[in-house]
Amino acid sequence: MSVSELLENKKKLVPRSINTLYQSGKEAVHDPDAAIQDIITQGKDKKIEPKLDGLAAKAKGIDWPTLIWIGGMHLAALAAPFYFSWSGLAICLVLCWVTGCLGVTLGYHRLLTHGSFVTSKPVRWFFAFVGGISGEGSAIVWVANHRKHHRFSDQDGDPHSPREGGWWSHILWLFPKHSSDEIQAHCKRWAPDLAKDSGVMFFHKTFLLWHFVIGGGLLATGWAIYGLDTGVSWLLWGLAVRMVYVFHVTWFVNSATHIWGYRNYETTDDSRNLWWVGLLAFGEGWHNNHHAFQRMAAHGHKWWEFDMTYWVILAMERLGLVWNVVHTPRGTGQTASPESGGAVVKSA
């Protein structure tokens, strides 16, 4: 569906006060209008914002736990072909969709970062959980990094701009060492709404635990049913291979879609639409569209820009699990025509 078609079928959202952000109930569970946009668009606060970005971060030393975590998963994934099983592959594919599409793309990104729709606390906590078992960090850390990326996209302050190197934007930005005080201040600065969410903070504090629970469960279940080799297969394919896949398709959004591809809209950053990232990353590869209309639930704006995650959101809306979905473009603070919803349409 094109942007013009979306505008013709425009659905109005009633703005609510920021005070409703933390209230429970269907009418006021999450208020992206007042809270999230204020967080993303506000200026730097030198008193509480640590330097967690750019070249300056590279001099802080290495975060060895993160390096070992990511490196270990890659090494384990290399062993997976020696323990191949069709059941292991099936588990891998299902969990890729659950953690990548539902967890990272729909939950972490479109709901918790940008507030593209409203849902209940239990559903939001479910997305925080399945996003966490993707292995990409807890919801509050992920969201804080991504909101900061939008505030300073491809400028000084962007945590992972390819202007500082393709490998930096893809993976190396994850490895500089930061103190717990810096990380806490970073999350307070960029995700204060999530810091006050008890469910999100529970999964933040128990982030590592769930990986041991799931890994142990896969190993034990496969072993009990089919034998040790199958248990190892389920562990390697259901944990390591799945995690490495979701890692890289997410990282390609940070790197590749700011380097290659085409642009439907003129934005102040280097964002691009890249078809193969769109397919692999459940619709996240239409990144120029997203940077033009950050709160819009649909990232694919042309009929052929396949966006699986938006289809899931539509299905959940039909079932009454989510509501106030941002179907139409809403302003990004840029000066533009009404037809573009806040971005400048690039001429053909």
Annotate each PLM feature.
Residues W190-S198, W260-W286, A292-F293:
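Active-site-proximal inter-transmembrane loops
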Residues V246-N264:
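C-terminal accessory segments of proteins
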Residues T99, G103, T257, L279-A281:
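Short glycine- and Lys/Arg-enriched binding-loop motifs that mark or flank ligand-binding interfaces
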Residues R110, S255, I259, H291:
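Catalytic glutamate of the conserved HExxH
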Residues M1-W251, M296-A348:
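Non-catalytic, topology-defining segments of multipass membrane proteins
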